[in-house]
Amino acid sequence: RGDVLAYVPADRVVYTGDVMFIGGHPVIWVGPWSNWIKACETILALDVDVIVPGHGRIVGKAGGREMLDWIVYLKDQAKLRYDAGLSLEDTVREIEVYAPIDEWIDRDRIVTNVNLLFQEFGGRGAVKTMDDVIRVQEKLGLMAPLSASEGDHHGHAH
């Protein structure tokens, strides 16, 4: 179960599938969150120069480290606020999106991720359905309408 990585030692390349998102906020639909962290750590432990993510531009290890650092930070920040009794909405509002992460697209995915983390932390304050997640995203002003002129912003040629 889960995602597949393709490691090509001779070329010092790893293909990450949906484990890595570069230039856009990553999203995890089901946990546990710790598996995502472990998968990123596994990728970064490989003897590679090139990481080909499932979403976004091709990067070196620094780009992969950036994503790993973000998902660890997001978990830690969500846990602090969960333990303090904050709501899902207030938690998302309070988490500082630092540079260069603040330039990433798909910021609305923070709600999905924090909601999953709230479920893992015990469930208090987590919403139950994707429709509920979308309502929180809309309430926080995180859902931007997509226009046809924006095209595909995930680095894939469809």
Where are these regions (language model features)?
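Metallo-beta-lactamase
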Residues: R1-L80
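C-terminal regulatory/interaction regions
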Residues: L86-H158
